[in-house]
């Protein structure tokens, strides 16, 4: 798929298709008005006849419009002009791309990037158009015997920008959008892989491959023997019921002019399958527990995008790979684990395993003396109850870092909402036998999970992203979303300086 930007008049475009917007009720966008004038009112006559109202997502494909050089014109319903917001814009782009791909328009010039989207500039509109296009065209069918094929798929897309001065901004937006989309695709692919393929060793192989592909990335894999030497007893306990070895993949990206500059650390929960262990989950939808490694998948995707963008940062990405299975060797409710930090944890529920893996990973990264640490995990069902499937949960021990991540979430459209972490919630983790319990009861489950992790992140600025509600979708079109890759990459773009962003 080839992307480019240009600045030109619609009547001069010689392409398979021109894409322009129509607002409710049957109001032509400025670009559509130009085409209508050139075609002697042909388009407006169709609208008066009622062929298109302009409601969001409506499509009308026109052939051989009078006096127009392009073969086709696609009219796209954009809703009410003053109500065109971020979500609607992205939905319109996705529907447009699907229509172009299905109708044999192998190339197109898209003028939707000239629409006014409240509070957003050309950079944002072009980048989101690229990301939405890639998202719309994504498929995961490698395990199907008969793969459906599009006869004449969309291969080339040109986004028009209002002025020539904005061409460089548009080109940067395409570069960023493609890099982020590459990371999102990598994350989706990892998440969608079946758990009999994507085990901890598979995660490690992907981390090694990333190092093979980019000179700026090195990877080392820590297996169970080394974990024992490091004292990662909590991490090891979670995986001891599985015949698949637990593996923690450590990817180091060196892009900063000073190789010794303090790194940003990203940690991803990589439970490649979570049965719940002895505290076995219900069988209904248990297949979706292959997505319990989507935190690690998003960190992997962010590292890939980072390497493609070649940002001037030092970043460490940790994939905390593990599998939680029931067996005679599994850890049990009632066990007391000594973590790498020396703190002890009473296990009350073996299905609250992600925090037992992450706590040792959080201790491990102290050796980097990090600038900050962000962990990502599909950690709690409570986050789905609190925030649904639209917004990531965010907790942090450092206000400036939390504000940075919230800002990045707003910029990228991959939204997050900060939850509190006051001392009262910590009391729910009290145990009569150990330093803490691994669960704090039903009330405030996302917050108490964050409070648990915070006890292992006292030596640096830390934030936790709970993506349990956003990492995948269920139902007939189930699959990984690749979130929060774009949030993480936007955070890294912002950290790399204004010249890297807009």
From Swiss-Prot:
Residues bound to Mn(2+) 1: 274, 351, 353
Superkingdom: Bacteria
UniProt catalytic activity: Release of an N-terminal amino acid, Xaa-|-Yaa-, in which Xaa is preferably Leu, but may be other amino acids including Pro although not Arg or Lys, and Yaa may be Pro. Amino acid amides and methyl esters are also readily hydrolyzed, but rates on arylamides are exceedingly low; Release of an N-terminal amino acid, preferentially leucine, but not glutamic or aspartic acids
E.C. number(s) listed in UniProt: 3.4.11.1, 3.4.11.10
InterPro entries: Leucine_aapep/pepB, Macro_dom-like, Peptidase_M17_C, Peptidase_M17_leu_NH2_pept, Peptidase_M17_N
Cofactor: Mn(2+)
One of the GO biological process terms: proteolysis
Record-linked PROSITE patterns: CYTOSOL_AP
Binding site for Mn(2+) 2: 269, 274, 292, 353
Annotated active site: 281, 355
Cofactor note: Binds 2 manganese ions per subunit.
Cleavable signal peptide: none
GO molecular function, one term: manganese ion binding
Cystine pairings recorded for this chain: none
Keywords, alphabetical: Aminopeptidase, Cytoplasm, Hydrolase, Manganese, Metal-binding, Protease
One Pfam family this sequence matches: Peptidase_M17_N
PANTHER family in alphabetical order: CYTOSOL AMINOPEPTIDASE, LEUCINE AMINOPEPTIDASE-RELATED
Function, as annotated: Presumably involved in the processing and regular turnover of intracellular proteins. Catalyzes the removal of unsubstituted N-terminal amino acids from various peptides.
Family (UniProt): Belongs to the peptidase M17 family.
UniProt-recorded name of the protein: Probable cytosol aminopeptidase
Organism: Aliivibrio salmonicida (strain LFI1238)
The gene coding this protein: pepA
